[in-house]
Amino acid sequence: MEDDREEGSCEVIRARLRENFDGKIVRKDLTKKIKEGANVPVYVLEFLLGQYCSSDDDEVIHAGVEKVKRILADNFVRPDEAQKILSVLRQHGSHTVIDMITVRLNIHNDSYEADFSNLGLKAVPVSEEYPTKYDRLLCGGIWCIVQLDYEYVEEDKKGTPIRIRKLTPIQMPHVDLDELKRGRKVFTTKEWLDVLLRSIGMEPDVLTNREKWLLLARMLPLVENNFNFCELGPRSTGKSHLYKEISPNSILVSGGQTTVANLFYNMGRKTIGLVGLWDCVAFDEVAGITFKDKDGIQIMKDYMASGSFARGKEEKAASASMVFVGNINQSVDVLLKTSSLFDPFPPEMGTDTAFLDRIHCYLPGWEIPKFRPEHFTNDYGFITDYLAEFMRELRKEQYGDAIEKYFRLGKNLN
């Protein structure tokens, strides 16, 4: 596992990143500056910064930041301004918007149609070239810059007057894993670890080696299918940040209350729940986890054990990882004397050995320092959407037997 190559300085790492991942990296302090005033997902913001600010020249960076601000101000669609933008589109005949676009095939008339999330438009005709070229449009949708035309035709009252002239994704439309692996080879293991940590906004130079690996372990549910992960620790250590802000493929269930229909399967609508729609379902504040259904926790245990669950007459399978994060308000020593390390869980989960057996990894959150300004990086890292997409691609590769090369597990482990 060790890499004997000589470690490079920050400048060397930056040069290697620019050479091998140009357009896919961004200076993280720029994200912080613009994010404060822009109500737009981090991964969209960083994609734009990666396009216009991937340089060491301060003038180029300044011009790029101004361009990104202008693009967001002029084109980003806020849901409460949807009608105003449609009116501008009608008056001028054309307008460019930034919105989340989902495309589906209408099999009745053999054509593709696009839905706009914030703009509220449904079934807008879209050329076949876009879903063919950008398959993520068909798999849950991606954020795009879209040039729209408005042309009302008296004879075609049933159709929509809105047409898509051009569509450009502002998320990674596709990630080439082979290209990533080729680029990875020019970095040592330590350098690559630092790059990954900077990509999620952390500064590795102020962390110990163990703290680095603990932070990296938070990414496990995003790269492994059906991985059950638990982290309990003090406040202000960023336990839920990764699942809420960094990856567009994970969802954070705040407050803890949920239903079997919402999480697993809705019998009335015949639709799959969160575990079928997301790569990772994270529960914030485990102390508040409650199911309105009596059989909720039992169904969750079945899913955590096998990756499937029974609803009605059929069994459904899904690949989402389950993450449980929560706060420990006492010291660990006191907790171990008075109860257990699973004390923050509701009793029906924290004292159920069948549930605890299904947890693959318990991350000791008390070993991660409380975050201060110096813990956040101003250096280069991958744009979050690129990081999230290559983590999603890694879910397709199996590493379940990798541990056998280094360890032999006893028979008493299940």
Can you describe what each PLM-predicted range is?
Residues 188, 192, 292, 296, ...:
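Helical mechanochemical/support elements of P-loop NTPase systems and associated helical scaffolds
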Residues 182, 186, 208-212, 377-380, ...:
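Conserved phosphate/pyrophosphate-binding and hydrolysis machinery centered on Walker-type P-loop NTPases
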Residues 2-199:
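Extended, charged/polar low-complexity intrinsically disordered regions
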Residues 203-334, 339-343, 357:
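Conserved ASCE/P-loop NTPase catalytic core
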Residues 315-322, 327-414:
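Phosphate-sensing "switch" segment of ASCE/P-loop ATPases
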Residues 196, 200, 303-307, 390-395:
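Hydrophobic, Leu/Ile/Phe/Ala-enriched alpha-helical segments that form helix-helix packing faces
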Residues 129-134, 239, 345-352:
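Intrinsically disordered, low-complexity boundary segments flanking structured domains
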